[in-house]
A protein has these predicted regions:
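An alpha-helical, amphipathic repeat domain used for nucleic-acid recognition
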Residues: 1-171
Length: 171
């Protein structure tokens, strides 16, 4: 195919999936990785599954334990806190956007170990200091605070971590 044909070619129209096709696709997806009920609903909307049938498909997935928001939230909290170094606020916000209920989010966030949270943040801030350009200690403190807060940590924890990381760097 030449370049002009690729440019003028219209995107393929996707045929809407039936409820049965969506169920099979979601079962395959959920068998490979955890999905939330919100993820499943978004995918069904993208696949143009009829509105009336979406809830039935979701109920079947939940009944057969392909989708469990509690299990999903626990895995998400574990992954984002340990691997990505996120704080509780950012994790909770992301879970809310994925359609997980507040009660499940609160329960999943209960597994966070607050004793490990501060040392991890201090280590991330130490690495950040090495790559940050600054002209004064005041400017560096501001940049580190913004960084810690953007990771989703509470203000008190962020402030302690910034102070600890600056003391260790002799700044």
């Amino acid at each position: 195919m030449c370049r002009e044909q690729l440019i003028t070619q219209k995107p393929r129209e996707r045929k809407p999936k039936s409820a049965q096709q969506a169920l099979q696709s979601l079962m395959r997806l959920c068998a490979r990785s955890e999905k939330s009920s919100g993820d499943a609903l978004r995918l069904m909307q993208q696949w143009q599954v009829p509105q009336a049938e979406r809830q039935g498909v979701l109920e079947r997935l939940v009944k057969e334990r392909f989708i469990d928001d509690g299990r999903y939230a626990e895995a998400y909290v574990r992954e984002k806190s340990r691997l990505s170094g996120w704080g509780a606020r950012k994790i909770a916000m992301q879970l809310r956007q994925k359609g997980v209920s507040q009660a499940i989010i609160d329960e999943a966030l209960g597994q966070l170990d607050s004793d490990v949270e501060l040392p991890r943040l201090v280590e991330k801030l130490r690495r950040k200091i090495r790559t940050t350009k600054y002209t004064s200690d005041y400017e560096l403190r501001g940049k580190l605070m913004r960084y810690a807060l953007s990771l989703g940590f509470d203000y008190d924890i962020a402030q302690c971590a910034v102070e600890d990381s600056l003391v260790e760097q002799d700044l």
